[in-house]
Regions:
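A short beta-strand motif characteristic of beta-propeller blades
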Residues: 13-18, 62-66, 108-113, 156-161, ...
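Hydrophobic beta-strand positions that form the internal "hydrophobic ladder"
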Residues: 35, 85, 130-132, 178, ...
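Active-site-proximal cap/loop segments of hydrolase catalytic domains
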Residues: 330-531
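Cap/lid segment of the alpha/beta-hydrolase catalytic domain
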Residues: 1, 13, 241-247, 251-383, ...
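A flexible loop/linker signature enriched in serine peptidases of the S9 family
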Residues: 1-3, 18-23, 29, 38-49, ...
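Conserved loop/turn motif of beta-propeller repeat scaffolds
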Residues: 1, 32, 82, 127, ...
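Short loop/turn segments that connect beta-strands within beta-propeller blades
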Residues: 8-12, 54-58, 101-105, 147-151, ...
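Non-catalytic accessory segments flanking enzyme active sites
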Residues: 72-125, 158, 169-170, 190, ...
């Protein structure tokens, strides 16, 4: 929850007016005195109301919009062109926008196009047109445009057509160029299109497994594209790319305290075959002098929900494991969108078990390829990825030396069946509504809490936050309690309840490192690594 303050930049004085209970979503109108902001629902903590505030005036703020459907997230921003204030509404399967001329802050917001089930899109403005990335009749999205005076869907015209093997993600508009961020073969690429000639090219990143994205580009009339690049061995790096000469200029690279030599580390992209024949990409990183011709300790991570793709990025924290001989691997399982929208649809609702089976099959592939063995294989996931961990240790309890389930969503049926729990109704498109029998039966068949049996589980660390509003603290607690009642053998089961943390851990710049240290201490102890 944010408080909004206003400061006079000429005098340096902070104005006494303060706005509380905000999401932090703010947009200035062009009169430099009107601001639009989003307030939170005190129970669900969702942004649900958009207000207009006049800086320096004592009149009450005016409510511009109230979203009463709690399956939607809402906010407000200003278009890059500076011409429009834009209210956005997004749920699991729906996007919706309202626009207002930023020169007329006292006007009325106009809906961009009628809200439609299963229609997801994003908008940007340049000159006198809106550009739209949409899944309308395009599973992996296409790019369209329309006049800013006629924005309903019947007026949209295609700019870039749908491609079955390419997932169009985002765009950046320039006067002479159009930049498209897209995913092909599971990797994010940046495509540069010359608006005049129509010629296009791609930036060569020079690595096999990486991630990249368009950074902040405030100007239209420039030939420089600013983007960010990272890989499992390359720290986050900001570049300016000349779209005419194709020359790169490194502007900044994150410093690794204590020194870092990327030449000591190697990354790979390998592919496992799922039990249904689908391909599962796996990204790995290890220290070259530690990866000997014998199985190593290996930490396998995945998330696999909400269409969120876990790209291979650099982590200085991870070096602590790599320098001690661990291999770190990301299984790009279904439930994310590694191969486009179909990957997501194949890992949600009544296809959710594909997420778990992909993770298990990725682990078995790593064993088969002799990167590790079960006695050295560890699993990790958090939140919805914690559900993944809870499921895979039920399916294959003897496959793992240890497992970390962070703030895990493990009591799926109970949570999804209770619409009074904040955020539940907004999750039904992802997991299904167990008040319907087909969803209930399927969800019950994999729900980690409900599928606990009297068996020997791997060593486990389960973490939770007392102030977690997304996975309430009692969910991991009851899960661990039931595990203890069913626990066989002599493996260790730890519960860490952080009494100061929410879903994303403790606030503060450095406090999260204590949580990393706890997880790594668990792994190193099991691996017999003492220093």
């Amino acid at each position: 929850i944010y408080d909004i303050y206003f400061k006079n930049l000429k005098t340096g004085k902070v104005i006494s007016q303060t706005i509380s209970n905000s999401t932090g979503s703010v947009a200035w109108a062009n009169d430099n005195k009107t601001v639009f902001y989003t307030s939170k629902n005190q129970t669900t903590l969702l942004g649900e109301k958009i207000w207009r505030h006049k800086v320096g005036e004592k009149s009450d703020d005016k409510l511009m919009y109230h979203e009463k459907d709690d399956t939607f997230y809402n906010g407000v921003y200003k278009s890059k062109s500076g011409k429009f204030i834009i209210i956005y509404h997004s749920s699991t399967l729906i996007s919706d926008y309202q626009i207002l001329n930023a020169d007329n802050p006292d006007g009325t917001f106009k809906r961009f196009t009628p809200r439609d089930f299963n229609h997801e899109y994003s908008i940007d403005h340049f000159d006198d047109k809106f550009y739209i990335i949409t899944n309308w009749k395009a599973e992996n999205n296409r790019l369209m445009e329309t006049s800013d005076q006629k924005t309903s869907i019947s007026n949209w015209k295609e700019v870039i057509s749908h491609r079955k093997d390419v997932h169009l993600l985002s765009m950046e508009i320039f006067t002479n160029h159009l930049v498209i961020s897209e995913r092909k073969n599971g990797l994010r690429e940046l495509r540069i299109i010359n608006q005049g000639s129509g010629e296009d090219s791609y930036i060569d990143f020079g690595e096999d497994t990486y991630t990249s994205w368009i950074s902040v580009n405030e100007e239209f009339n420039t030939n420089l594209l600013r983007y960010t690049f990272s890989s499992l061995t390359t720290p986050f790096s900001t570049y300016d790319y000349n779209m005419d000469t194709k020359k790169l200029d490194l502007k900044k690279r994150d410093e690794v305290v204590g020194g870092y030599d990327s030449n000591k580390y190697a990354s790979e992209r390998m592919y496992a075959t799922a039990r249904d024949g689908k391909t599962i990409p796996i990204s790995l990183v290890y220290r070259k002098d530690k990866k000997l011709n014998q199985p190593q300790n290996l930490l396998l991570y995945a998330y696999g929900a909400y269409g969120s793709t876990i790209d291979p990025y650099f982590s200085s924290v991870r070096l602590s494991l790599l320098d001690r001989g661990f291999i770190y691997a990301i299984a790009h399982v279904r439930g994310g969108q590694i191969y486009g929208r179909q990957s997501y649809d194949d890992g949600k609702v009544l296809n959710k078990k594909n997420t778990f089976f992909d993770f298990i099959d990725a682990g078995k592939h790593l064993i088969q390829e002799e990167y590790t063995i079960s006695e050295k294989l560890y699993a990790q996931g958090g939140s919805a990825g914690g559900l993944l961990i809870g499921a895979v240790v039920n399916y294959e309890p003897l496959m793992w030396k240890g497992a970390i389930a962070a703030v895990p969503f493990v009591d799926a049926v109970t949570t999804m069946a209770d619409p009074t729990i904040p955020l539940t109704s907004g999750e039904w498109d992802e997991w299904g509504d167990p008040r319907e029998k087909k969803y209930y039966d399927y969800m019950l068949s994999y729900s980690p809490y409900d599928q606990i049996t009297n068996t020997e589980y791997p060593n486990m660390l389960v973490t939770s936050g007392f102030f977690d509003s997304q996975v309430q603290y009692w969910e991991p607690l009851k899960y661990v309690a039931k595990l203890r009642d069913s626990w066989q053998g002599y493996n260790k089961l730890y519960l860490h309840m952080n009494m100061e943390a929410g879903h994303s851990g403790k606030s503060g710049r450095f406090r999260r490192y204590k949580e990393y240290a706890l997880e790594y201490a668990f792994l190193l102890d099991l691996g017999g690594i003492k220093k």
